[in-house]
C-alpha cells in the first residue's frame, strides 16, 4: 500500500496532460453489476464490457491501445447505430476511443471518456473495409477548411450528415460534439427537420470525428449527468460566437485533477492492495 500511495503522489505531481495514470494499469474490467460512476470527466466504470472487434457493421481503430471498453448501454448504442448505417447503405462505421477497462483518466488525448458512456466515431464511412494495418494506424480526414469557418466542400458527404443525424435521434444520446464548422454545415443542410440539431454541440477540435455521449443509465445511481442542452437548434448567435475573434486570456496554471468519486477511489485502492 505504501508503494501505491507513493506512486500516486508521484503521478499527480506531474502535469495531468502528460502524466501516466493508475487507471492504465488496470488491464481488465472490474467485476460487478454495470455501473457508470461519477462524471464524464471524473469517474470510472464497474462491469464494463469490451466492444467486439469483429463486426460486419463497424470496425474498431487502434485496438492495440485497448480503449474499446464501455458500459453495456454504450455497446448497445454502437450496435444500433452501425446497424442503421448499414441498412441505410452509408458505409462502415469507424469506432475510435471509448474507455479503458475500468474507465478513469487517460494519460493523453481525452479529459472525458471516463465513465464508459463516451465514444469517438470518425466522420468517414469507407465502402471497403479497412485492413488491419489501416486500423492500427488510421488516417483521419480533416473536414474543416484551414480558416476554421467552413467545411471543405469536396470532402463533405451527405452520408456523414446522415450518420450524425442517426446518432442524434437515438434516445440514449444527450450530446454530440463536433467542430463548429461542421455544426454550421449541418445547420445549413438540415432543412425543416431540425429537432435533432440541439444535441449537436460545437467544440474545439473534432475536425474528423464526432464525440457521442450517452445519458446516465437509470440504475447507475452514482453517475452524474450534464444539464440538458439549451432549447432550439443552436444555429444562431451561440454558434456564430465560435467564429468571432477571441481576446487572449492569461495562460492557465497547472492544475491537479479533482478528487475522485469515493467509489472510484475505493476501486483503485482495492485493485492495488490486491497486487
UniProtKB/Swiss-Prot annotation:
EC main group: hydrolase
Disulfide bonds: 44-264, 187-235, 216-223
Region described as Disordered: 234-262
Chain positions recorded as Zn(2+) 1 binding sites: 110, 113, 120, 211
A Pfam family assignment: Peptidase_M74
Chief location of this protein within or outside the cell: periplasm
Intracellular or extracellular location(s): Periplasm
Keywords assigned by UniProt, alphabetized: Disulfide bond, Hydrolase, Metal-binding, Metalloprotease, Periplasm, Protease, Signal, Zinc
Enzyme Commission number(s) of this protein: 3.4.24.-
Keyword Protease set for record: yes
Cofactor note: Binds 2 Zn(2+) ions per subunit. Zn(2+) ion 1 is bound in the active site. Zn(2+) ion 2 is bound at the dimer interface by residues from both subunits.
Gene Ontology CC annotations of this record: outer membrane-bounded periplasmic space
Single GO BP term: peptidoglycan metabolic process
Signal peptide feature range: 1-19
InterPro entries, alphabetized: Hedgehog_sig/DD-Pept_Zn-bd_sf, Peptidase_M74
GO molecular function: metal ion binding; metalloendopeptidase activity; serine-type endopeptidase activity
Superkingdom to which the source organism belongs: Bacteria
Binding site for Zn(2+) 2: 147
Cofactor(s) of this protein: Zn(2+)
Record-stated family: Belongs to the peptidase M74 family.
Oligomeric and partner information: Dimer.
Function: Murein endopeptidase that cleaves the D-alanyl-meso-2,6-diamino-pimelyl amide bond that connects peptidoglycan strands. Likely plays a role in the removal of murein from the sacculus.
Name of the molecule in the record: Penicillin-insensitive murein endopeptidase
Organism: Yersinia enterocolitica serotype O:8 / biotype 1B (strain NCTC 13174 / 8081)
Gene name, Swiss-Prot/TrEMBL: mepA
Amino acid at each position: 500500500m505504501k508503494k501505491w500511495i507513493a506512486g500516486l503522489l508521484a503521478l499527480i505531481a506531474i502535469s495531468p496532460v502528460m502524466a501516466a495514470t493508475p487507471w492504465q494499469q488496470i488491464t481488465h474490467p472490474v467485476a460487478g453489476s454495470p455501473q457508470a460512476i461519477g462524471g464524464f470527466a471524473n469517474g470510472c466504470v464497474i462491469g464494463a464490457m469490451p466492444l467486439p472487434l469483429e463486426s460486419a457493421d463497424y470496425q474498431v481503430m487502434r485496438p492495440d491501445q485497448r480503449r474499446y471498453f464501455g458500459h453495456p448501454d454504450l455497446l448497445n448504442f454502437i450496435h444500433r447505430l452501425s446497424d442503421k448505417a448499414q441498412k441505410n447503405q452509408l458505409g462502415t462505421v469507424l469506432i475510435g476511443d471509448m474507455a479503458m477497462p475500468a474507465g478513469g483518466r487517460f494519460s493523453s488525448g481525452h479529459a472525458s471518456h471516463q465513465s464508459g458512456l463516451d465514444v469517438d466515431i470518425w466522420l468517414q464511412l469507407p465502402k471497403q473495409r479497412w485492413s488491419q494495418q489501416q486500423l492500427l494506424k488510421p488516417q483521419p480526414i480533416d473536414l474543416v477548411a484551414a480558416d476554421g469557418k467552413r467545411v471543405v466542400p469536396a470532402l463533405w458527404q451527405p452520408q456523414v450528415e446522415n450518420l450524425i443525424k442517426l446518432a442524434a435521434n437515438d434516445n440514449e444520446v444527450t450530446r454530440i460534439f463536433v467542430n463548429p464548422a461542421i455544426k454550421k454545415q449541418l445547420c445549413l443542410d438540415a432543412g425543416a427537420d431540425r429537432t435533432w440539431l440541439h444535441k449537436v454541440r460545437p467544440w474545439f477540435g473534432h475536425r474528423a470525428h464526432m464525440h457521442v455521449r450517452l445519458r446516465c443509465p437509470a440504475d447507475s445511481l452514482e453517475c452524474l449527468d450534464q444539464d440538458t442542452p439549451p432549447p432550439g437548434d443552436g444555429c444562431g448567435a451561440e454558434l456564430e460566437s465560435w467564429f468571432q475573434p477571441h481576446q487572449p486570456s492569461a495562460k492557465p496554471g497547472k492544475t491537479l485533477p479533482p478528487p475522485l468519486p469515493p467509489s472510484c477511489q475505493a476501486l483503485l485502492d482495492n485493485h492495488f492492495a490486491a497486487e
